A protein has these predicted regions:
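N-terminal ligand-binding/catalytic initiation module
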Residues: 1-127
Length: 127
């Protein structure tokens, strides 16, 4: 992400969501905001989530998401816009929803970020 004249430009944002095992739906996993996150890390974390859920006998597949952003460098409003954009991309690709993929917090995210995700999903899908 880059900031230009107080506008957040998302063209350069790297956003990821990996679903490791869709054998048992929905899949479940956290959403991480970190400046150095990449697709390989997200895929590895999704795989680990599958194993964690299996060990705990939770009947979900594993998933993990990531947004490449250093939250210390952006305002709350900018982080909100990035979160809502990420959520819209997940909706477009059917990577979010109670029957498909249950997102949760992880490093760099919190209750507020999860609320923005929920609100965006609810406003678009009406669920």
């Amino acid at each position: 992400m880059i900031r230009q004249n107080s506008y957040l430009i998302l063209i350069l944002t790297f956003k990821f969501r990996a679903q490791h095992s869709t054998y048992k739906l929905p899949v479940k996993g956290g959403t991480r905001y970190a400046p150095n996150i990449d697709l390989q890390e997200v895929e590895a974390l999704a795989t680990l989530m599958t194993f964690k859920l299996a060990i705990a006998d939770v009947p979900f597949g594993g998933a993990k998401g990531g947004v490449k952003i250093d939250i210390r460098k952006y305002s709350q409003g900018e982080i909100e816009r990035a979160t809502r954009k990420y959520t819209m991309e997940l909706i477009k690709k059917n990577f979010i929803g109670a029957q498909v993929d249950c997102l949760g917090p992880d490093m760099g995210t919190n209750e507020q970020v999860m609320t923005w995700i929920k609100d965006t999903y609810k406003n678009v899908k009406g669920e």
